[in-house]
């Protein structure tokens, strides 16, 4: 995964999990949930790397800043936007036939888990992101312990 870092993607390991963070501008136009062509390319590369890890559970979280949306249609607020973004990321990733949809969970976190301040442009930009949280599937381990 390290080779994918940079250009809007960061990787952190903590508490036995791997966190992959994708900046909004890599994937989406502001306030939108449709993935752009650059984002599709990045997600396809990520899917290729993830496809070698069959024993992972992957939570895809959408995060927004705290600016309310003035949305109409399907996306009415930051909750909707964060969920739709997470879901669309998963839909691109699972186009890779080696990734099993059962490995994935989509979650919308809206503006409630910021990594920076929402009081300035740079902080809000940091908060608008997709995070993939990779955790080992421990089912086989638990079966051994029974």
Which sequence ranges carry the predicted segments?
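Structural motif
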Residues: 17, 57, 127-129
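Periplasmic OmpA-like peptidoglycan-binding domain that tethers envelope proteins to the cell wall
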Residues: 27-41, 49-53, 63-145
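Short secondary-structure junction motifs
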Residues: 8, 55-57, 101
